[in-house]
A protein has these predicted regions:
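N-proximal low-complexity "stem/linker" segments adjacent to membrane-targeting elements
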Residues: 1-70
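Short, acidic, metal-binding catalytic loop of nucleotide-sugar glycosyltransferases
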Residues: 68-83
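Acidic donor-binding loop at a coil-to-helix junction in glycosyltransferase catalytic cores
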Residues: 239-245
Length: 442
């Protein structure tokens, strides 16, 4: 066999492996769609203490952090919730001056001399755990809601968190994340690539409600403070600390400890291709670092997930090349046969031109065209049951992008409306700060 045949075999092996994944994806989408977003948003005043933790290198330099802080304040005012605190875990001294004046807001400075086995973000997370321990906030009375730099909270987010805590369904929970922020400024390729991530949260519902999870988001994560204090974030040099944290929670507290709160968190996609690939690189390398810390069956699931994730990209590039090469080679033959036999029916022309474009997807078509070319005869093409079966993963793939894109665009409109309110709030708080400073000066 030549190189092209080997490439076909590799691609077909990958394509067939996507069929069970597509069926599982469809099943989870159908099963979880009703609980994906929390719809019971009644305001019942049994307010627990929630600490909204934003872990960042610098809230002053990374301007989107300020947007997230004011989104919390705005949502809390609208639902009349005051039993909360915003904790900015940072390495930048300037953040104290900028945010400490805000009500219910503290700046936790990560000591440069702080020594622990954890690295990067997990080091800051562990420092925050120990800081809460010193302040007596490491009890079941407190809940921690983790956010990223660009995270944005809505009224629905807060009400969903309060409901989950009120109903006592677990000690940790996650919710859906959508990516409408700065969506219009992102590179079109990265914006499209991020469209599949909201759809992936349907799988996260099953991961959290039927643990153990083989992955967990580090943002939109609600966890009881005493549980986080016990587990900690001291996992060594891993780049995917959230994945290990989720498994350790399950290992320590069991299946019923994890749940789904259904509160939507808005975030922004990587704005350029480099950031997009660096993000994916961190996920893959982090999972590879963690894989030996999971039981055998979970190692297999993680390995399959990583392989299919990586091979999906490789297969897509290889498939595109094969489509173009095969189409360019087969199209002249198909047209010549149609011209020689004086075929004028446009449907037949369309049929054979399309079949020239899809031989790598439908091997039976490719064989028919080759035979047709040698016999110089035309007859109906039967694409076969295997080809129809292979269409299913493609349909699910397209559907996942369309649903994710719909969610991103839907919440882009919501964010545009809320950001106007947040700007008004920002200006009002700025005026109060100026008045306060003026009184002190006098």
């Amino acid at each position: 066999m030549d190189t092209l045949h080997y490439l076909y075999i590799i691609l077909l092996t990958f394509w067939f492996s996507t069929i069970p994944v597509a069926f599982l994806t469809m099943t989870r989408f159908i099963r979880n769609r009703k609980i994906f977003v929390e719809k019971d948003l009644r305001r019942i005043h049994n307010d627990p203490i929630i600490i909204f933790q934003i872990t960042t290198k610098s809230a002053t330099k990374i301007t989107v952090v300020e947007r997230g802080i004011y989104s919390i304040i705005d949502a809390a005012i609208k639902i009349n919730y005051s039993n909360y605190k915003i904790s900015i875990v940072t390495e930048d001294e300037n953040d104290r001056q900028k945010f400490d004046h805000l009500k219910n807001c503290e700046t936790v400075m990560v000591d440069k001399k702080y020594n622990t086995n954890a690295i990067k973000k997990s080091r800051a997370l562990q420092f925050a755990v120990e800081n809460r321990r010193k302040n007596g906030e490491d009890t079941s009375k407190f809940w921690i809601f983790h956010m990223d730099d660009e995270s944005y909270v809505t009224n629905q987010t807060l009400l969903s968190l309060l409901k989950f805590i009120r109903e006592g369904k677990g000690i940790a929970a996650e919710g859906p994340i959508v990516y409408p922020l700065k969506f219009e400024l992102a590179n079109p390729i990265t914006a499209l690539a991020e469209s599949v991530r909201p759809f992936g949260c349907y799988d996260c519902v099953s991961q959290m409600k039927n643990p153990p999870p083989i992955h967990m988001h580090g943002s939109n994560l609600l966890v009881r403070s005493d549980a986080e204090d016990l587990i900690g974030w001291n996992f060594g040099s891993t780049l995917a600390e959230d994945q290990l944290f989720g498994y350790k929670l399950y290992e320590k507290y069991g299946r019923k400890a994890l749940g789904w709160h259904g509160g939507i968190l808005l975030e922004q996609p990587p704005l350029n291709i480099k950031d997009h690939f660096m993000q994916r690189r961190r996920w893959i390398l982090g999972s590879l670092q963690n894989i030996n810390k999971f039981p055998f069956w979970h190692r297999f699931k993680i390995a399959f997930k990583l392989t299919s994730y990586f091979m999906g990209f490789v297969s897509g590039i290889a498939s595109a090349i094969l489509y173009i090469v095969t189409f360019m080679s087969m199209l002249p033959t198909s047209i010549q046969i149609l011209v020689d036999q004086n075929i004028s029916n446009p449907l037949i022309w369309a049929q054979y031109i399309i079949s020239s474009f899809f031989p790598s997807t439908f091997p039976e078509i490719s064989l028919k065209i080759n035979e047709m070319a040698s016999n110089n005869s035309i007859y109906p093409i039967d694409i076969g049951p295997i080809s129809i079966l292979l269409l299913f993963p493609y349909i699910m793939w397209l559907l996942s992008y369309q649903i994710g894109l719909f969610l991103n665009l839907k919440h882009f409109k919501l964010f545009s409306q809320q950001s106007v309110c947040n700007r008004k709030l920002f200006h009002e708080l700025a005026k109060r700060k100026i008045r306060s400073l003026s009184r002190r000066t006098v």
